[in-house]
């Protein structure tokens, strides 16, 4: 969708901003109704919303500035960030399965990004955005382990509201890389597509991502989330002309295998 919106004139990530605003408009009546009933509306979760929404926005914008495979792999280095955050903030000690996950993830990252140098680093602004997005989103996931909410609605509404604010600020701050704000005509011409993907894709997937850990367990969800790497790598090789070779295949496979091992080898009490 990002590439389609960009081709339709919504450059600079403004397509994502439009989707976020549509989500806010659709969910606002429910938020108001919940507030009148004395229930949580989601507005009282700014920190959580900024972390989850901001991480996702960085991820979405990175696709406009780097290759699909690079964005996927850098964003899904989240096991590294969650391990660091769990040690620092939750005082958890990582087990053997987590260490194996980290080694495989780092190994996969090295294989993909070590074409030019032995010590690879992100090469462009899109790479850095994807890496930062993974770290921010991981912080949001850690936050979800700590807070208690009245169902999934407060989370999804805070994601859209505070994610929109983050997206607008990021759009202006990164205008040198993403380009200026599009014309009104561009928004009008893409309005039907924006509404369609917001209602049938953006909002439902957001609900599933934020709701599923409490229903399916973190282990199964981690495998499902990592499966996006497989889908993304495969689709990018079919739909785009971006680099796709043995490095991308092996590197992404190592990250996915690491996620599976983390679940299979985890102690039963977890």
Regions found by a protein language model. Give the residues of each.
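Juxtamembrane helix-entry segments on the extracytoplasmic side of multipass membrane proteins
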Residues: 9-13, 38-41, 114-136, 176-197, ...
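Helix-helix packing/entry segments at the starts of transmembrane helices
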Residues: 18, 72-77, 144-163, 202-238
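Hydrophobic transmembrane alpha-helices of multi-pass small-molecule transport proteins
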Residues: 27, 97-115, 247-266
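C-terminal-most transmembrane helix of multi-pass membrane proteins
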Residues: 20, 226-270
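Transmembrane alpha-helical segments that form core, pore/gating elements
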Residues: 3-4, 27, 82-83, 119-178
């Amino acid at each position: 969708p990002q590439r389609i919106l960009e081709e339709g004139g919504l450059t600079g990530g403004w397509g994502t901003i439009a989707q976020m605003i549509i989500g806010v408009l659709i969910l606002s009546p429910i938020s108001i109704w919940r507030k009148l009933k004395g229930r949580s509306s989601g507005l009282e979760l700014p920190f959580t919303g900024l972390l989850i929404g901001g991480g996702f926005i960085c991820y979405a914008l990175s696709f406009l500035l780097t290759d699909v495979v690079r964005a996927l792999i850098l964003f899904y280095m989240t096991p590294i960030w969650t391990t660091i955050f769990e040690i620092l903030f939750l005082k958890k000690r990582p087990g053997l399965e987590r260490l194996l996950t980290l080694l495989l993830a780092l190994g996969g990252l090295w294989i993909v990004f070590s074409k030019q140098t032995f010590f690879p680093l992100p090469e462009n602004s899109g790479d850095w955005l994807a890496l930062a997005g993974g770290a921010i989103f991981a912080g949001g996931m850690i936050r979800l382990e700590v807070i208690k909410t009245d169902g999934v609605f407060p989370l999804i509404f805070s994601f859209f509201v505070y994610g929109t604010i983050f997206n607008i600020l990021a759009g202006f701050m990164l205008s040198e890389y993403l380009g200026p704000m599009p014309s009104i005509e561009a928004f009008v011409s893409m309005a039907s597509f924006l509404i369609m993907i917001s209602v049938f894709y953006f909002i439902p997937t957001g609900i599933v991502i934020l709701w599923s850990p409490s229903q399916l367990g973190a282990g199964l969800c981690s495998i499902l989330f990592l499966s996006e790497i497989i889908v993304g790598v495969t689709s990018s090789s079919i739909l785009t002309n971006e680099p796709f070779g043995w490095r991308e295949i092996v590197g992404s496979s190592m990250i996915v295998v690491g996620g599976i091992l983390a679940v299979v080898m985890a102690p039963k009490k977890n």
